[in-house]
Amino acid sequence: MNLLNLPKIELHCHLDGSLRVETAIELAKKEGVKLDSYEYDKVKELLVIPKECNSLEDYLNRFALPVKLLQRAENLERVAFELMEDASKENVKYIEIRFAPLLHLEKGMTQKEVIESVIKGIRKAEELYDIKGNLILSCLRHHSIDSVYEVIEEGKNFIGKGVVAIDLAGGELEGFVKPYEEVMKLARESGFRVTIHAGETGYGKNVRDAIELLGAERIGHGLFIFNDEEAYNLVKEKGVTLEMCPKSNIDTKGVNKYEDHPIYKYHKDNIRVNLSTDNRTVSNINLTEEFENVHKTFNIDFEDYKKIYLNSVEASFCSEELKEKLKLSIII
């Protein structure tokens, strides 16, 4: 299989974890952000996961610089465009980019301006490249519940205009789900589709709760459903798609190596999986490389690839019309 040339669907990709190093250097200089060095390798060290990373919390520290740099509309528009451009060059046909609007208000932008600027970057790339994109609005679990209401209130105006879903992200604690039940009900009623980061750091029950209490249609990671039989069966029976990011899980010590990752076992047991990068820069990987690693480790064949692709199309939050077009890309 020529994995680079095959069409791909990316459903789990964070904007602020996927900046080009060159762009970070340019923006740091432009914004007057003081760094010890502006040399490529030194700046890359600030953005890419260190070898001694021990946890998800360590991993999340790589977002400090990108958030500082993305406080102006033109910067957000640029990095959204560049992420789309990078993805298009490896035949990603559709991508759902996620980010937290409330992290980008430090220099006076409104949430509306923040969301508009990212959508603008996506649309500009769509005009130039064979790729389509939509936006998922992430809310951070260490912020207040009120902040989720704020995101829903502003974001609902963009449903069908570039925004498709809402997400809960950040550090994961056992039993985090219950307090979000009411606000996620409002999100669904407001037109948001729902994907939730859960089961990334050892708590399979969080996945079950995210589906049953929050109405999650997809789960970000879902790695640890193997340690909760009810969660495992629920994901399988309901056809909930797991957005799986093996390199990221290795980086955060969810698993130690590709051989230990359950993605192939889940796939073979007819659990729907999507393969994504999570954070292209932080994890220092693109989607083709991620597929190559999974291919080498588990010897997946074209039928496996095709099934993952078509499951990913079905799980996407794009229009039915676009889904039909995307399906045609893999019919050989």
Swiss-Prot record:
Reactions mediated catalytically: adenosine + H2O + H(+) = inosine + NH4(+); 2'-deoxyadenosine + H2O + H(+) = 2'-deoxyinosine + NH4(+)
List of residues binding Zn(2+): 12, 14, 197, 278
GO molecular function: 2'-deoxyadenosine deaminase activity; adenosine deaminase activity; zinc ion binding
GO cellular component: cytosol
Keywords: Hydrolase, Metal-binding, Nucleotide metabolism, Zinc
Cofactor: Zn(2+)
Matches recorded under InterPro entries: A_deaminase, A_deaminase_dom, Ado/ade_deaminase, Metal_Hydrolase
Metal-binding in keyword set: yes
Active site, UniProt feature: 200 (proton donor)
Chaperone in keyword set: no
The protein's Enzyme Commission number: 3.5.4.4
Binding site for substrate: 14, 16, 170
Residues the UniProt record annotates as site (Important for catalytic activity): 221
Biological process terms in GO annotation: adenosine catabolic process; hypoxanthine salvage; inosine biosynthetic process; nucleotide metabolic process; purine ribonucleoside monophosphate biosynthetic process
Family of this protein: Belongs to the metallo-dependent hydrolases superfamily. Adenosine and AMP deaminases family. Adenosine deaminase subfamily.
PANTHER family (alphabetical): ADENOSINE DEAMINASE
Role noted for this protein: Catalyzes the hydrolytic deamination of adenosine and 2-deoxyadenosine.
Protein name (record): Adenosine deaminase
Origin species: Clostridium perfringens (strain 13 / Type A)
Gene, per the UniProt record: add
